[in-house]
Amino acid sequence: NPYAFGL
């Protein structure tokens, strides 16, 4: 997810 660590 773009908002957390690129996960």
Curated annotation (Swiss-Prot):
Any one GO CC term of this protein is: extracellular region
Tell me where in or outside the cell this protein is found: Secreted
Say which domain of life the source belongs to.
Eukaryota
Q: Can you cite a GO biological process for this protein?
A: neuropeptide signaling pathway
The alphabetized UniProt keywords are: Amidation, Neuropeptide, Secreted
Positions of post-translational Leucine amide modification = 7
Main role? May act as a neurotransmitter or neuromodulator.
The record's family statement is: Belongs to the allatostatin family.
| Protein name listed in UniProt | Carcinustatin-5
Name the species this protein comes from.
Carcinus maenas (Common shore crab)
